[in-house]
């Protein structure tokens, strides 16, 4: 069993220095040329008060403002298109007031390209609702590997108004079959550039021991036509157990626009429903384990390798240690990849070769080999503990970025 035994001395390089916070999203934080890191300036991940989306050149330290919010709105959680300098991020409401301000169900995705901003997802909260349009808040927007679609997590204004307990988190996708135009019968409604639907299905009261879930979250692309995500099941005893699910997506525009048994845009008493034939499938069955379920701490997003053959996630081993595990998108038994003596402390990402995964271990930046599980430390002697939120490889694989003490840092990977 491989343990972390290797260490090669590499220089850690601090990239930002301004006396403010710099926040990386958990993936896709580099421009396609591997020259710039994109970030937001929220004081912490728990507050949504940043006014700018910015980028820093890793070689020169030059900082550029990509977008500045106005009218009292705030922005954050930016990711980058894999092939062009196109940025997608969360935008809070303009002119917020007591009745309508930033919340899980009051936020949208926007895309900035060439300095121009456009709404990704439209919103229509006046019945009858509009197909291709959602009713609330989208969050953590990530382009598919080919850049054609955007995944996100979602909360619903209509259900929140009915009963907050019915506003269950779900996973959605923005597909390039817009624009979608809203008649704007409410001052807070807006149109969007993409056709948006939910692709997960939740219920407020899952049957204990079943595959039903009351929350779908922390999704990751599996190739360009499937998404894996964490779904909260109930054990036979009624305890929450987060399990891994996968959903295959429609292949063409007609598939994205075809409703199933329930309306794509929902009703006054039900959430929006997935397109016809889009049905989530459970991949892990961990109720019997000593430490059931994927872990929620550290918060992590499930991530598939670039080849589309292995989905990685974090789960405790039989000793209670948080380790990396791999499973095929087709299912089967998960394979424990790492055998560390201490918990993996952060979200993780794949090296673009698919041969390594990067994360925080023992308050250092580390890589695990995707076949052997052997762990190599890339850094040591951190003045502050690296943040658990993001460890992200550059597209060329040469750099690994993280946050530490409110600043952005990189190190060479030699990979």
UniProtKB/Swiss-Prot annotation:
A biological-process GO annotation: galacturonate catabolic process
Gene3D superfamilies: TolB, C-terminal domain
Pfam families cross-referenced by the UniProt entry: DUF3748, PD40
Annotated InterPro entries: 6-blade_b-propeller_TolB-like (IPR011042), DUF3748 (IPR022223), PD40 (IPR011659)
Record's protein name: Uncharacterized protein YidR
Organism per entry: Escherichia coli (strain K12)
Lineage: Bacteria, Pseudomonadati, Pseudomonadota, Gammaproteobacteria, Enterobacterales
